[in-house]
């Protein structure tokens, strides 16, 4: 066993470790933060080393086949438990082999952790018999753009260009991410530069640009682009539907109606997507009866209402406290021969929650089970949010414990439960939920970290809060100004300015690091 431990840490890591400890010991108040991290590094290296021998034995048999989800989950655990200093060696020693499906799964799980995601992306690229798929590149482009690493994003695009992997969707993603960051000019530039990448813009790209602008609440700019470029492309029903949805979100119902009429005049027949958007717009404008009239006027032989349309109607009736109409609409859908999906059931659950009819909520869950419809994280979140808002926290936790047996909670689910226990001053239980979430391989969001750090600050558990903040930064997640400011005030009050300086330096690295070696 000792032989494996010696091999688990290479010479460069040992040099870094000892020089690192020598520097840190000059500041006694900082030691408790860094010492904790250093011990974790050594322990994890030993553990991963022992596992690697067993993993190698398992993989020596051609009969051993691992499920993609299981491998992705195991890689996720390595990523979440390993500091950046030893991340590559931890992945190497895990013995886990990657495939395109596995990499895509992991990238999806860590889509909100740009730094960590990119480290894994780099590591996987070096593995034998593996090449990144177009989808993996697209997911990485999204992750880097999300943390405003645009230079790296274009480096990825150029790498795809060399491999002849670029397509229109690549630039649609770039336009969408720029627009979401309110970089409208850059989004339009991405559209115009396609020609230089041997991809002449087509109607799909044009629609992609309009969609990016509309979804980022820049519908007026989208309308302007449409007017200026409509002669270059022949608008189709999707083009008009995009603008229709954009004006609906503005919200500007008269302009949405105008676009709808223009669509008809241009000879573009509304499809089910157009009708769905129009129903959604009217419902959000408080005109659910008019929306229902549109549904009634649809010719079932040409355009049959979808479960999405019914879910919107049920949801709207619920928010307007028209529970009877919500139930009637649900039953009408079933009578039409259409089977309710999880989205429709969730709308019905929301309607019953709004009316505080919890017995009916639990009956709906039973009906879902009898009809083979599995609740999802949103089902759980709707119920939890309602119970927590009403102060029924014990019942909320009971629902949480039951729901995790039938569905996969997301980060929002865990965040609500952790926040609930922090507010109840039950930090031990909050910590248990946090550890359970990590064990299940669910990647914490910025909000998940924030609620726990804020809870620890409230209890004046400064050391744990600092370690958690450091872990958050290590994962490439930037803390909110409120969370960092709260911990900062606490450290100043406790006269731990050196620890604050250390955390500030870590933050600066996260903000300024270009992510590429």
UniProtKB/Swiss-Prot annotation:
Keyword Mitochondrion applies: yes
Location(s) in or outside the cell: Mitochondrion
PANTHER family: PENTATRICOPEPTIDE REPEAT-CONTAINING PROTEIN 3, MITOCHONDRIAL
Secreted found in the keyword field: no
PPR repeat start and end residues: 133-163, 167-201, 202-232, 236-270, 271-305, 306-340, 341-375, 376-406, 410-444, 445-479
GO cellular component terms, semicolon-separated: mitochondrion
Cross-referenced Pfam families: PPR, PPR_2
InterPro entries: Pentatricopeptide_rpt, TPR-like_helical_dom_sf
Domain of life of the organism encoding this protein: Eukaryota
Record keywords: Mitochondrion, Repeat, Transit peptide
Main localization category: mitochondrion
Transit peptide range per the UniProt entry: 1-59
Organism of provenance: Arabidopsis thaliana
Name of the featured protein: Pentatricopeptide repeat-containing protein At1g77360, mitochondrial
Ranges in coiled-coil conformation: none
Similarity comment: Belongs to the PPR family. P subfamily.
């Amino acid at each position: 066993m000792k032989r494996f431990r010696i091999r688990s840490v290479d010479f460069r890591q040992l040099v870094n470790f000892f020089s690192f400890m020598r520097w840190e010991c000059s500041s006694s108040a900082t030691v408790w933060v860094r010492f904790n991290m250093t011990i974790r590094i050594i322990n994890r290296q030993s553990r991963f080393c022992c596992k690697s021998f067993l993993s190698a034995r398992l993989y020596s048999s051609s009969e051993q086949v691992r499920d993609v989800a299981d491998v992705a989950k195991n890689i996720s655990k390595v990523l979440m438990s390993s500091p950046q200093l030893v991340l590559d060696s931890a992945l190497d020693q895990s013995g886990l082999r990657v495939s395109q499906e596995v990499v895509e799964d992991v990238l999806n799980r860590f889509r909100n952790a740009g730094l960590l995601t990119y480290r894994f992306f780099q590591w996987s690229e070096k593995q034998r018999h593996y090449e990144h798929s177009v989808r993996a590149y697209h997911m990485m482009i999204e992750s880097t753009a999300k943390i405003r690493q645009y230079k790296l994003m274009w480096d990825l695009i150029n790498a795809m260009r060399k491999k002849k992997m670029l397509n229109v969707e690549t630039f649609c993603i770039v336009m969408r991410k720029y627009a979401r960051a309110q970089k409208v000019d850059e989004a339009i530039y991405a559209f115009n530069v396609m020609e230089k990448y041997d991809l002449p813009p087509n109607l799909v790209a044009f629609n992609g640009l309009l969609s990016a602008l509309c979804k980022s609440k820049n519908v007026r700019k989208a309308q302007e682009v449409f007017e200026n470029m409509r002669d270059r492309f022949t608008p189709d029903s999707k083009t008009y539907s995009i603008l229709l949805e954009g004006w609906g979100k503005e919200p500007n119902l008269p302009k949405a109606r105008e676009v709808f009429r223009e669509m008809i005049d241009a000879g573009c027949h509304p499809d089910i997507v157009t009708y769905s958007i129009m129903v959604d717009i009217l419902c959000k404008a408080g005109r659910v009866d008019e929306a229902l009239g549109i549904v009634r006027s649809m010719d079932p032989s040409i355009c049959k209402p979808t479960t999405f349309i019914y879910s919107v109607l049920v949801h709207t009736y619920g928010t307007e406290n028209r529970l009877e109409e919500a139930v009637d609409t649900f039953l009408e859908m079933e009578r039409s021969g259409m089977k309710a999906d999880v989205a429709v059931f969730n709308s019905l659950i929301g309607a019953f929650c709004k009316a505080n009819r919890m017995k009916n909520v639990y009956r709906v869950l039973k009906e879902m089970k009898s009809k083979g419809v599995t609740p999802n994280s949103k089902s759980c979140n709707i119920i939890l949010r309602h119970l927590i808002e009403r102060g029924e926290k014990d019942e909320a936790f009971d629902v949480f414990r039951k729901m995790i047996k039938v569905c996969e909670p997301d980060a929002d689910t865990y965040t609500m439960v952790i926040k609930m226990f922090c507010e109840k001053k039950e930090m031990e239980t909050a910590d248990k939920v946090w550890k359970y979430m990590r064990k299940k391989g669910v990647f914490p969001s910025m909000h998940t970290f924030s609620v726990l750090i804020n809870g620890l600050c409230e209890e004046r558990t400064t050391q744990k809060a600092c370690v958690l903040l450091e872990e958050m930064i290590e994962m490439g997640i930037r803390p909110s100004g409120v969370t960092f400011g709260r911990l900062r005030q606490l450290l100043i009050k406790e006269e731990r300015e050196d620890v604050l300086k250390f955390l500030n330096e870590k933050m600066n690295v996260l903000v300024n690091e270009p992510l590429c070696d």
